[in-house]
Amino acid sequence: MKNISLLGASGSIGTQTLDVLRSHPDQFRLVAFSVGKNIDYAVKVIQEFSPQIVSVQREEDVLKLQAVSGNTKIVYGSEGLLEVALHPDAEIVVNAVVGSVGLLPTLRAIEAKKTIGIANKETLVTAGHLVMEAARKHNVSLLPVDSEHSAIFQCLNGENEKRISRLIITASGGSFRDKTRDELHHVTVEDALRHPNWSMGSKITIDSATMMNKGLEVIEAHWLFGIPYEQIDVVLHKESIIHSMVEFEDRSVMAQLGSPDMRVPIQYALTYPDRLPLSDTKQLNLWEMGTLHFEKMNQERFRCLRFAYEAGKTGGSMPAVMNAANEVAVEAFLQKRIGFLTVEDLIEKAMNHHNVIARPSLEEILEIDATTRRFVMEQI
């Protein structure tokens, strides 16, 4: 029986993580979780899983939950998030929160020697050098939950990582993959939220449409697998059947395939190095697919992917700036305050405005995050 702490239980990854726990009640126990403002959902999860600690975002929601939570301790805010991450009984901490708020809980959980199921891209994007350094220092495993990184992780099982020639990350292309840049001037929030292949939260669905999601994944892969950016490629693959590939020095290519279902990589992270049945996911029959398609990525068409490569290669504090600018811009687009292509413009402005710090401390990263957010808000 593995004890799980889940950060971000009401989001897309969080709800699918709970599906996995539900499927294997003899294997996993939920000891703590956090939610944002979805208190009705939190009540249902408490009643079903009886965790010891639950954290909510706002203090005013604590009393509401305490009235129905029985013996479950209710905490709130950033301190509450840390309490969930550091629950003494938790063996695995699944970080499924959205945005850079996931950074501090991850670092503290690593210091407490918890195994990390990492679904929060922004943690590695903003502070990859600090996170990987801490993981090495405390001998902690970072197990990828993203389908692409899980695919690479599985392809590398038993392989000599020094023999890697390149990583090939697949991209569905998002909601607007078939639109021209001229057509993108007129797209709506509702259009952007209709992803062709995956069921995801609103922020990541917009990131998928701008291709920033894939850019964040490139930076994440660089840190997780220690591969230079020059050896990480992205290929457009509309069917989302091949989740990523690894090419070795002898030009052999290993690929991980499966029907698009986030519960598969989530469960693999929780059961690693073992596997368990996942009976209600769709079996992949290639003869039903017929044909798989691949296209070279155009970084002028998908400018956010180019920004991510530039930020990653520049290094230091630049990825944190790009990430903060993107979070503010995407939120403004979701609120219908800016157009879709303005997201790219705001990120570019923030990156051009920033003076890079080569090796920022945690305090400097948090300060850069805050100042970048203020700068972008002033531009809107």
From Swiss-Prot:
Pathway the protein acts in: Isoprenoid biosynthesis; isopentenyl diphosphate biosynthesis via DXP pathway; isopentenyl diphosphate from 1-deoxy-D-xylulose 5-phosphate: step 1/6
Segments crossing the lipid bilayer: none
Enzymatic reactions: 2-C-methyl-D-erythritol 4-phosphate + NADP(+) = 1-deoxy-D-xylulose 5-phosphate + NADPH + H(+)
Binding site for Mn(2+): 146, 148, 217
Cofactor(s) essential for the protein: Mg(2+); Mn(2+)
Gene Ontology terms: biological process: isopentenyl diphosphate biosynthetic process, methylerythritol 4-phosphate pathway involved in terpenoid biosynthetic process
Primary role: Catalyzes the NADPH-dependent rearrangement and reduction of 1-deoxy-D-xylulose-5-phosphate (DXP) to 2-C-methyl-D-erythritol 4-phosphate (MEP).
Family listed: Belongs to the DXR family.
Chain residues that bind 1-deoxy-D-xylulose 5-phosphate: 121, 147-148, 172, 195, 208, 213-214, 217
This enzyme's EC code(s): 1.1.1.267
Record-listed NADPH binding positions: 10-13, 36-38, 120, 122, 201
Organism of origin: Bacillus cereus (strain ATCC 10987 / NRS 248)
InterPro entries found in the cross-reference section: DXP_reductoisomerase, DXP_reductoisomerase_C, DXP_reductoisomerase_N, DXPR_C, DXPR_C_sf, NAD(P)-bd_dom_sf
GO molecular function annotations of the record: 1-deoxy-D-xylulose-5-phosphate reductoisomerase activity; manganese ion binding; NADPH binding
Keywords, sorted A to Z: Isoprene biosynthesis, Manganese, Metal-binding, NADP, Oxidoreductase
NCBIfam families in the cross-refs: Dxr, PRK12464.1
Origin: domain of life: Bacteria
UniProt-recorded name of the protein: 1-deoxy-D-xylulose 5-phosphate reductoisomerase
